[in-house]
Design a protein with these regions (language model features):
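Domain-level signature for soluble enzymes in the chorismate/prephenate branch of the shikimate pathway
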Residues: 1-286
Length: 286
């Protein structure tokens, strides 16, 4: 072995030791933050801050290490420390056609956080509602379907569930993930907060006489940029259609926009509210 190669390996070993020291120091600091959050009754999980952190790291990143690897490394760090802080658990929807959502969930939550499969969409939402799990990973909405799972987020009383994150998280960017079978949404009782670059989901329950075109037009008149509009029908509610609006930007649950929309749709509207959203992560497609 050449002296040069040996010297390089010695340097790498020293770097590994430094990295490990910093990881241990980081974990200790995060634990201190967790304790302060508990004393102040603050939200333990902060997807908005995590998204800002990833954006900051990717903005300064250079060299041969793939950007996707940076995301995976820091997601693993966040997941591991979060488990130590709160004992988080995850359920992932899976049906007879397989489970494309499992790998996405594992990439986001990390290899340490306990995860289990569930074969019912409503059961996954119910597990969050009943505090049986911290997060549920569910299929991305379809443009038109019956009895969609996301309708369970409408008109809640004390549950306070919301969509918190979109998956895959910085894996290959949106260009290669437009197929809804390869995308997922995360539901939790943690609050969806602004990260400065977000999409919000608005829930609307409207009479069937209100067309999708009218919905989009009225939203546009009130400054809402619609990314997608998903609709759901139910045999139990034949006179109403539920709509899930994927809108650009952060919309607060108490935004005056919601009252304005209720007035626009008037008697045709049975529900109008924010049901969560997701922070954007920079594209990783090169």
């Amino acid at each position: 072995m050449s002296k040069t190669l040996s010297d390089i390996r010695v340097k790498i070993d020293k770097i590994d030791d430094k990295v490990h020291d910093l990881l241990m120091e980081r974990a200790s600091l995060v634990s201190s933050i967790a304790e302060a959050k508990r004393k102040s009754n603050l939200q333990m999980v902060q997807p908005a801050r995590e998204a800002k952190m990833i954006r900051r790291l990717l903005a300064r990143h250079n060299g041969p290490l793939p950007r996707q690897a940076v995301v995976r490394i820091w997601r693993e760090l966040v997941g591991a420390v979060a488990l130590l802080q709160t004992g988080l658990t995850v359920v992932v929807f899976a049906d007879e056609h397989g489970n494309p959502h499992w790998d996405m969930a594992k990439d986001y939550f990390g290899s340490i956080v306990p995860m289990k499969k569930i074969n019912s969409r409503a059961g996954a939402v119910g597990a969050v509602r009943n505090d049986e799990t911290s997060f549920a990973v569910l299929p991305w909405p379809e443009l038109d379907q019956n009895d969609a799972w996301w309708v369970h987020l409408f008109d809640q009383h004390s549950e306070k569930m919301s969509i918190l994150c979109a998956l895959p998280y910085g894996s290959h960017g949106r260009k290669s993930t437009q197929n809804p079978t390869h995308r997922s949404l995360v539901v939790s009782k943690f609050e969806f907060l602004p990260s400065d670059d977000d999409c919000t989901f608005l829930g609307l329950d409207l009479r069937v006489s209100v067309s999708r075109t009218r919905v989009v037009d009225r939203l546009a008149e009130h400054g809402v940029t619609v990314v997608n509009l998903y609709s759901s029908k139910s045999s139990a509610r034949p006179d109403y259609n539920a709509h899930l609006v994927e809108a650009r930007g952060y919309i607060a649950p108490d935004s005056p926009l919601l009252d304005a929309l209720r007035q626009v749709f008037d008697a045709d509207c049975r529900y109008c509210g924010v049901v969560g959203g997701y922070p954007a992560v920079p594209e990783l497609d090169e």
